[in-house]
Design a protein with these regions (language model features):
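Acidic-leg catalytic submotif of subtilisin-like serine proteases
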Residues: 4-10
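Short beta-strand "acidic-cap" motif of Rossmann-like dinucleotide-binding folds
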Residues: 7, 44, 143
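Short, well-structured N-terminal submotif of metal-dependent ribonuclease cores
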Residues: 22-29
Length: 191
């Protein structure tokens, strides 16, 4: 039984162009070495689309793609903005959820991970979509309140105060996680 820390969409282009995202950088940056020292698998998830748009589905993704290189695969804006170590995993996604069309579940299962702590932006998008996918797959879930943000703070608060707890998630701050129980094995969601 082990845990993974999911760090979603904290990439250069997003941090540079969406001011609300900057608030999560200090607590997540402080958390990373503690999580690694506790034996937690750190997984960075980034978003990028093919330059020719072959992987676009729907207007939301097309709108991101039209922003130019900001979301084009291989562009500097799609690179993880925080320090990535050799033991970390980086997953490329082309949809909102970190699980949709990626090998994230395969990596987590191969490492014996049964519990996830979620951070990233935006709370109502990447974090929520990944949360629902992870819950459906039977992972125990913790959402790190100050490690997530949304353009509308009220939406963020609604998710972390109402939605995520109603689905069985533990809500903590980055400073409170990983608790000792998380490194030895965390509770899992009902399967």
């Amino acid at each position: 039984m082990s845990s993974a820390l999911i760090v979603g969409d904290l990439q250069a282009g997003i941090l540079d162009n969406y001011p609300f995202t900057k608030a999560v950088v200090p607590p997540v940056t402080e958390l990373l070495p503690r999580a690694r020292a506790a034996g937690v698998l750190v997984v960075f998830v980034r978003t990028a689309f093919r330059a020719n748009g072959a992987d676009l589905a729907g207007e939301v993704f097309a709108a991101f793609h039209r922003q130019g290189d900001l979301f084009h695969e291989g562009a500097p804006g799609t690179e993880v903005a925080l320090e990535v170590t050799a033991d970390d995993v980086v997953v490329l996604k082309r949809r909102t959820s970190a699980f949709a069309g990626t090998d994230l579940d395969l990596v987590l299962r191969a490492r014996g991970v049964d519990s996830l702590a979620l951070t990233g932006v935006a709370t109502s998008a990447m974090v929520a979509a990944t949360f629902y996918d992870a819950s459906d797959r039977g992972y125990g879930l913790t959402v790190l309140r100050d490690g997530c943000a949304d353009q509308d703070p009220a939406v963020h608060e609604f998710f972390v105060d109402k939605i995520f707890p109603s689905r069985g998630a533990e809500i903590l701050t980055c400073a409170e996680w990983p608790a000792p129980s998380r490194t030895r094995g965390a509770r899992t969601a009902p399967r």
